[in-house]
Amino acid sequence: MIGDDFKAQHPDYLRLLREDPRRAGAAIRADYRAWFAQAEQYVRERRGDVLIEGAPGSVEELFDSALPYAASGYPVELVVLAVREADSRQATALRYARSLQIGLTPRFTTRSGHRTCFHALTDVVAAAERHPAIAAITVIRRDGRALLRHEAGGAGSASWALAAERARPYTEQEAAAFFRLHHGLWRALPRHRDELQEMVELARPLMPPGMQPARIDRPHPSLGPLPVTLRGAAYDASSFFSRAA
């Protein structure tokens, strides 16, 4: 189950998306969360298998969903996606741009909404690996590679694996892919370039040395602008979206 499926059933959601794609979800949150809770109860009562996708904004939000399953005799396992903050934010922009490209009316997560869920995950994992109701936690990379599996009472730190992957330096290939996608999004989302630049600044400290910003450690003489040959205006930013992960 995923919250977006319940949002889409709300009679006001499409209108709210057209008016404000960044806050439409928050406007109907109470309704779709209530429906989601009812669906969870329906599944538990019928002993159905269930996989829930979500981005909890707090420890309490996770446990409000997970603990009723444990109390009903379900083994509860978490799969945690460990992604750098810049990559995570860029992915939200990519989903938004792709949806616009095919004529949909998509949502676009706000800075503050992303920040809340991204940083809450640290607390969520720390609490979950200590809680007896959580049978196991598996931390995976963006490409699906498992980094660590922590089982209740066992060794291993899911919190450490999450933090380490989030702080992992980019390889040359990853850095090149990040900037290729950035350039495509820059052309596709001109109204959001301030946020796209924020994503670059988040990524910079983890970039290979050749892609780090220049240090300003001594005064330099004034320099005039150099002639730069621009790429053709016919450049198609959508080509990035069709290839990007």
Question: What is the predicted function of each stretch?
Answer:
Residues S72-E77, A133-A136:
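Short glycine-/polar-rich loops that comprise or flank the Walker A/P-loop
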Residues A55-G57, L81-R84, R142:
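An acidic- and aromatic-residue-enriched active-site/binding cleft used to recognize and process polar
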Residues E129-A245:
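C-terminal accessory extensions appended to soluble enzyme cores
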Residues E19-P21, Y74-A120:
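A glycine- and Lys/Arg-enriched "phosphate-lid" helix/loop adjacent to the NTP-binding pocket
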